[in-house]
Amino acid sequence: NVPENSRGPFPQQLVRIRSDKDNDIPIRYSITGVGADQPPMEVFNIDSMSGRMYVTRPMDREERASYHLRAHAVDMNGNKVENPIDLYIYVIDMNDNRPEFINQVYNGSVDEGSKPGTYVMTVTANDADDSTTANGMVRYRIVTQTPQSPSQNMFTINSETGDIVTVAAGLDREKVQQYTVIVQATDMEGNLNYGLSNTATAIITVTDVNDNPPEFTTSTFAGEVPENRIETVVANLTVMDRDQPHSPNWNAVYRIISGDPSGHFSVRTDPVTNEGMVTVVKAVDYELNRAFMLTI
């Protein structure tokens, strides 16, 4: 085993290979394989006389986690005196990589009025260190939430999966339309004293639901009806609706409940202003009807 990022000095001895016959005859040792005579070349070398094997430079586990070499022993004439042996060299991981979020900004949404426990989004960070050790085990936490309304803890995050869910009631789009949540990922199983960390931003948009009825701006509207004319707007009814403008939750639909038994009027919705346009659709005779009291 070789720890990565060793400071040396190099070359640094790893093992010594010896043949049982080296007391009887001179032996020459060599190694072959990736890291010796195959790229990357000469990461490892061996003293041909003593059999001492060395690493010549710092290792990087994230570049290569292990090496498989073969050691050979021959006599002075090049004749094999031992069968080649396999050498497996494993690079020991060090915590030298921070967790890296897949995205720096995540966008998610949640309906206003959602119950605690409602899923919002998932954030993910990867760590290049060994995931079977604490060096590569990432844990998540929420650092800040802006705004802190109606509570400073409107959301929580699963420390292992990165799933963000609501944890408190009170999401109201008409009060807070968007939250900015700073999320931190820390390796060493979330140990803030020893682990390496990184942060990302989660933008959570509170989506509108139809939780506000339209309200007339006044209880009485007045208008004048021209005699014997149709397709004329005689009154504009104004309403206020706190739901998201120009959404289905905001668009008003007007209906005449009473006061127009003969069907002289209809109320159409202005798609821009949401006003109700009281329109003459059947000609009115002044001599028969001098006034109408419509309930809408």
UniProtKB/Swiss-Prot annotation:
Glycan attachment points: 107, 236
Any idea which UniProt keywords this protein has? Calcium, Cell adhesion, Cell membrane, Glycoprotein, Membrane, Metal-binding, Repeat, Transmembrane
Example of a GO cellular component annotation carried by this entry:
plasma membrane
Q: Does the keyword Metal-binding apply?
A: yes
Select a single GO molecular function from the record's annotations and give it: calcium ion binding
Q: Where is the Cadherin domain?
A: 1-101, 102-216, 217-296
Q: Which Pfam families match?
A: Cadherin
Record's bilayer topology term: Single-pass type I membrane protein
Q: Which PROSITE patterns match?
A: CADHERIN_1, CADHERIN_2
Could you tell me which residue ranges are on the Extracellular side of the membrane? 1-296
* Tagged with keyword Transmembrane: yes
Q: Name one GO biological process term.
A: axon guidance
Q: What protein is this chain from?
A: Cadherin-4
